[in-house]
Amino acid sequence: MATTIKYQGTEIKLTSKYQGVAHPWGEKWEKNHYRVFVTINGAKVQFEYYCNDVSPLKADALIDALYCFLSDGIAYRNAKDKYDFACEFGYDRYEDRKRLSDIWKGCMSAYDKWTSLCDIDIYEITNWLQETYNL
């Protein structure tokens, strides 16, 4: 499935590719795994997305995936450092420090991918998505 949204005159194309069932958080947390592609003006980034929906992702799920991706980037951007991030999201009590580091790097990657893709303000589009699609 693919969908295109228009934000302030810019077309944002969202597509996904089903990757199968995954257990990224342990065996009892089975999720469908997708690779989501965001294309703006011919430039493209991709990210991993896990959800309960089955293949293919419908338009509303693709928009939700973009919102989650952008929210991760904002979480990174708003934190002073990895330890501030950990406290904000309750990871300061998290015993697996490697997992914390992986989550931090994933959020940093989301921010870096978005800012390398386009000059659309990450906060403004995230708020717009939330208001427009009731996320």
Regions from the language model: what does each represent?
Residues M1-I12, G20:
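Negatively charged, low-complexity tracts enriched in Asp/Glu with abundant Ser/Thr
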Residues T10-I12, I40-K44, Y133:
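Generic alpha-helical hydrophobic packing signal
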Residues Y18-N127:
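Acidic, low-complexity, intrinsically disordered interaction modules
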